[in-house]
Regions:
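A donor-sugar binding/catalytic signature common to diverse glycosyltransferases
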Residues: 64-111
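Short acidic-hydrophobic, aromatic-tinged amphipathic segments that line or gate anion-handling sites
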Residues: 60-63, 111-123
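C-terminal amphipathic helix plus adjacent low-complexity
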Residues: 117-187
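Nucleotide-activated donor-binding/catalytic signature segment of Leloir-type glycosyltransferases, i.e.
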Residues: 47-62
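Conserved catalytic-core segment of nucleotide-activated headgroup transferases in glycan assembly
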Residues: 1-48
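Short low-complexity, flexible loop/linker segments enriched in glycine and/or proline
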Residues: 49-51, 78, 111-115
Length: 187
């Protein structure tokens, strides 16, 4: 499994192919599971991996560089192991089927952590019957937003600094000085 975040956030559940099979087997016949690879991971997996996915009748592969927001907005719910898709789904008022045991979003009322095929089946049935007008979607988004804002800080000149190499050069010089001083002191 090339997705490095799976090994850190969900070491006990890192087989994405198995999860895709579980979800696809439990969806109604008229529902398609769209699988979107992280653009940075695309091409790392073997061709056989993608060929196996294409053989599953209700699975479609999205272009890795497509906008995630569009897929989430058109979904009934999203499936996440780790990464940002679960967080984005909460922000876009969509429930999440989570396989990442240690994801902080699992504490939100519209995120459903599962760890087995039977839990997947029961939770998908629950998600398909979920009242989309429920206040839980707004509550989840508000709680997540407030939690993120409470541990964030403002970077008012970020856009200005991104256009300049100054910050990179300055940080590089500081790090070079530190390395030099460490080695000089040891000699």
């Amino acid at each position: 499994e090339p997705e490095i975040s799976l090994m850190h956030v969900s070491p006990e559940f890192s087989n994405s192919y198995e999860i895709i099979c579980w979800v696809s087997k439990n969806l109604p016949a008229d529902v398609v599971l769209v699988v979107k690879e992280n653009p940075r991971s695309f091409g790392i997996r073997s061709r056989e991996y993608y060929d196996r996915l294409r053989k599953i009748s209700n699975v479609e592969l999205a272009q890795p560089d497509t906008n995630t927001k569009e897929w989430i907005n058109h979904s009934l719910f999203t499936v996440a192991i780790s990464g940002t898709s679960g967080f984005e789904s909460v922000y876009y008022d969509k429930p999440v089927l989570s396989y990442g045991k240690h994801q902080i979003i699992n504490y939100l009322p519209t995120v459903y952590y599962v760890s087995s095929f039977l839990e997947t089946r029961a939770t998908i049935n629950e998600l398909l019957c979920l009242n989309k007008k429920s206040g839980d979607l707004i509550k989840s988004k508000t709680v997540l937003h407030n939690a993120l804002m409470s541990c964030s800080f403002s970077l008012p000149k970020l856009a200005e600094n991104e256009k300049s190499d100054f910050l990179v050069e300055e940080i590089g010089a500081i790090l070079a000085d530190r390395l030099y001083n460490q080695y000089v002191e040891k000699i």
